[in-house]
């Protein structure tokens, strides 16, 4: 039977693996989700990685991520408590490794998903796991920009029932966060046209070649 130390080692390895995937596929990029005429943008800051792991730490969120990415995170640098139980982390981490699926696969957008503590205005789900998004605000609640940021990874399957409504995505675009326009198309519904409402955000090559 796995000892407490074995269990913690396994969690640590999962966090390290997840940080590598987050770093390679999500950090430093921006994603544009489009459904009907509506759209929103998501970025994945490095200091939001910790929220998604389900563990607690005395390190700053940035330090935690940096240590995990460099595989230097030690078992003494994170712990479990009543708000961050071991079972929760064990459930979340396999999904955290699969987080890029929510950017490059057909997903559903949920509006006003209610949890015990908060209502997430927008969430993205593949029906196996759900990423709750929060607006990018400063300490006083003022909006910094229009991006949504990842705040909560939920594995339970009741997110759809806890939301007001859901929409299947039509398109997902991505770009390097340092460039102005989205230049990569990751997901598309072939039966839909790119709406005019987002054309100012994407590279001309993506819609000039579009089927008439």
PLM regions with names:
Residues 1-118, 123-125, 173-212:
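An acidic, glycine-rich, mixed-charge low-complexity segment common to nucleic-acid enzymes
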Residues 130-189:
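Compact beta-sheet-dominated globular domain cores
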């Amino acid at each position: 039977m796995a000892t407490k130390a074995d269990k913690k080692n396994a969690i640590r390895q999962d966090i390290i693996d997840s940080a590598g995937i987050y770093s390679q596929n999500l950090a430093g990029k921006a994603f544009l989700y489009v459904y009907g005429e509506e759209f929103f943008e998501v970025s994945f800051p490095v200091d939001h990685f910790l929220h998604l792991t389900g563990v607690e730490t005395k390190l700053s969120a940035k330090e935690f991520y940096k240590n995990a990415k460099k595989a230097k995170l030690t078992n003494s640098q994170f712990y479990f408590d009543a708000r961050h139980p071991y079972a929760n982390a064990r459930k979340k981490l396999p999904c955290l490794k699969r987080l890029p699926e929510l950017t490059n696969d057909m997903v559903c957008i949920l509006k006003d998903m209610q949890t015990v503590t908060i209502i997430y205005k927008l969430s993205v789900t593949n029906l196996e796991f759900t990423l709750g998004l929060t607006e990018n605000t400063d300490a006083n609640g003022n909006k910094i920009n229009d991006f949504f940021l990842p705040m909560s990874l939920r594995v339970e399957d009741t997110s759809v029932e806890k939301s007001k409504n859901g929409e299947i995505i039509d398109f997902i675009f991505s770009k390097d966060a340092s460039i102005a326009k989205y230049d990569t198309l990751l997901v598309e519904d072939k039966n839909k046209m790119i709406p005019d409402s987002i054309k100012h955000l994407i590279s001309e090559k993506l819609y000039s070649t579009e089927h008439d």
